[in-house]
């Protein structure tokens, strides 16, 4: 049989996995060959010295010879696959001959059923109002008792209510499982009214700027007035920067002016964390009258561009 030949477009074997960024000896950046083709040439070049311990997978599949001389132990199937129960079910598990008191006739010890009858499901007539899915406490162990003491096993409760005598059942001891409700039915819960306003309330914090003072691990976003200082950790630096920013925002919203003087033109009342003069950090949209300025942050550049546009409009008016 002739093996199928690979096209020249595919990387020759052997080669390293694409995306491998480890050490590869005698590999230089070359123009015209891919990474896989270059590594393939180096691996197949006889003049290049190679280590006897190869890191590549073997080219040919190894032949495994299984030893059948020794006898193997019988295979034990998984118990979960043979047990007819639901996984993680921890409630009552009745036995094969489980019977409810007063519902099934007594078992005949001597009678033998013909083959194939045990696979036929039995139709049991249940009384009105009987719910088989009603939760019950764990069933107590079966006990032996006389059928006269427990009632007629065939007619059940009807034998107690009717005045006419019924045919007597054979005196034979039989295991009965008795169940009773030991817990009162759960009371109906009152319909709770949903408070819609609770979704709009902010949490009450001990400190007004407690959220700002917590430095999130791995956060690499913009922090106002934060500078890298030698010997100061990240958390302390963020707390100092936010304190300075809060002071500057307070002085900006409440400028100092003597009695009778007009408020300065830089007073812009705002409830946001950033002033109305500057744009949002990392905004990459169009800003009129803004060019690349040296030694100016993005916020100061946008503020300067805003004031230039504001002065230009006032001058034209």
UniProtKB/Swiss-Prot annotation:
Entry annotated with the keyword Transferase: no
Q: Name one GO cellular component term.
A: nucleus
Looking at the record's lineage, which domain of life comes first? Eukaryota
- GO BP annotations listed: flagellated sperm motility
UniProt-annotated location(s)? Cytoplasm, Cytoskeleton, Flagellum axoneme
Annotated region Disordered: the residues are: 131-153
Sorted alphabetically, which keywords does the UniProt record give?
A: Cell projection, Cilium, Cytoplasm, Cytoskeleton, Flagellum
Listed InterPro entries: CIMIP2A, CMI2A-C-like_dom
Keyword Iron applies: no
Q: PANTHER family, alphabetically?
A: PROTEIN FAM166A
Per its database record, what is this protein's job?
Microtubule inner protein (MIP) part of the dynein-decorated doublet microtubules (DMTs) in flagellum axoneme. Binds to the intra-tubulin interfaces.
Question: How does it associate, per the subunit comment?
Answer: Microtubule inner protein component of sperm flagellar doublet microtubules.
Q: Which family does it belong to?
A: Belongs to the CIMIP2 family.
Q: What is this protein called?
A: Ciliary microtubule inner protein 2A
């Amino acid at each position: 049989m002739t093996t199928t030949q690979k096209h020249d477009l595919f990387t020759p074997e052997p080669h390293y996995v694409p995306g491998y960024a480890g050490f590869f000896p005698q590999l230089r950046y070359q123009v015209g060959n891919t990474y896989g083709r270059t590594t393939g040439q180096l691996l197949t070049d006889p003049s290049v010295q190679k280590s006897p311990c190869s890191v590549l997978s073997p080219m040919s599949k190894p032949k495994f010879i299984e030893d059948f001389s020794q006898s193997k132990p019988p295979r034990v199937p998984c118990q979960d696959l043979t047990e007819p129960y639901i996984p993680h079910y921890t409630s009552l598990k009745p036995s094969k001959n489980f019977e409810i008191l007063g519902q099934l006739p007594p078992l005949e010890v001597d009678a033998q059923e013909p083959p194939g009858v045990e696979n036929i499901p039995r139709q049991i007539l249940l009384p009105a109002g009987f719910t088989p899915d009603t939760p019950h406490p764990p069933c107590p162990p079966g006990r032996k008792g006389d059928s006269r003491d427990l009632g007629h096993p065939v007619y059940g409760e009807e034998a107690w209510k009717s005045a006419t005598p019924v045919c007597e059942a054979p005196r034979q001891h039989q295991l009965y499982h008795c169940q009773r409700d030991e817990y009162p039915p759960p009371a109906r819960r009152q319909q709770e009214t949903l408070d819609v306003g609770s979704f709009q309330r902010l949490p009450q914090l001990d400190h007004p700027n407690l959220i700002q003072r917590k430095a999130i691990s791995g956060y690499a976003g913009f922090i106002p007035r934060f500078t890298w200082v030698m010997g100061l950790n990240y958390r302390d630096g963020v707390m100092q920067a936010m304190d300075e920013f809060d002071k500057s925002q307070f002085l900006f919203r409440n400028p100092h002016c003597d009695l009778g003087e007009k408020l300065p033109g830089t007073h812009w009342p705002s409830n946001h964390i950033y002033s109305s003069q500057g744009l949002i950090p990392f905004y990459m949209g169009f800003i009129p009258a803004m060019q690349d300025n040296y030694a100016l942050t993005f916020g100061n550049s946008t503020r300067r561009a805003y004031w230039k546009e504001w002065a230009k409009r006032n001058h034209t008016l």
